[in-house]
Structure formats: structure tokens, C-alpha cells
Amino acid sequence: MTKAKVDNQLKNMPGPVSIKKNQSPWREYKLSRIANAKDTIGEITPGIDVYALTMGQFDLADVMEHLLEATGPADVVVATWTAAKADLDRAEVFLKDKRILSLRFIVDQSFPNRQPGYFNRLVNKFGEGSVVVTRSHCKFLLIKGGGYSFIVRTSANL
């Protein structure tokens, strides 16, 4: 397909279309040795766009907690290749104390066989409908609430 055909199709599509995101004037790049997500990410404001490289001193659950402080109760999707018991425990606490209104996990098809205990815990704690099993190595976090929609791309598992 030629560029002209693609451009024409995009022009005729209904609603907003985004092919390439222009650099945000609010984008911050950080290399952090700070020990927590809150101080590394900083204040949450509309239009925030932060790229943070860390030394592994905090995890995805810490990022989730900081973002949930900004949103208040929110709907959450976690895509992970594997999950640790401590992070599953934290997600359960966030759900019980209503920081998370709904929670869905997307996990790799190998997870049930690789980590049957953790997989069964996911299903038992959060419900069968809360776990999607597919071929995936993606790691991301989606949070929507309080007028915010966050997308967190990460190399870290939950």
C-alpha cells in the first residue's frame, strides 16, 4: 500500500487518529536512583509524560500505587508475563480498599504451567473473568479514573 493510500484512508477515518505522537512539551526524561516511585515520577498533572529509567529500586506495584493516589478509585488493567506474591497481595489490598474498582490481568499462555500456584491465586482472588490468557510478553499498566487515563509501558513484571 502506498503512502498516499494510507494518508487517504486516515483522512477519511471517523474520529481522532494518531500515527505518531509529537513530543509533548511536558515530557520529562529521568534517570533515577531515587528509592520510590512517587519521588521519581513526581506530581501528577494533566498532560504529564514521563520517561523514567530506574535501577530497579521500585516495582510496577509502586508505580500503580502512586498513580492511584492521583486518580482516586480507578479501573486497572495489568499485562504481565509473571507476577510475584507480594505484588498480587498489594493488588488485592487496592481492590479491597476500593482504590481499584475493577481489575483485569493479561498474562502469557505459559503462565498457568510455569507458575500454577500464582495463576490459581489470580483466578481465585480476582475471578476467572479477570484473567485473560494469551500469547504475550507485554508488560503494561492501564489506569482510568478521576479524569485521568494513564498508560505505563514497562520492562518490569508485576
Regions found by a protein language model. Give the residues of each.
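PLD/PLD-like phosphodiesterase catalytic module centered on the HKD motif
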Residues: M1-L158
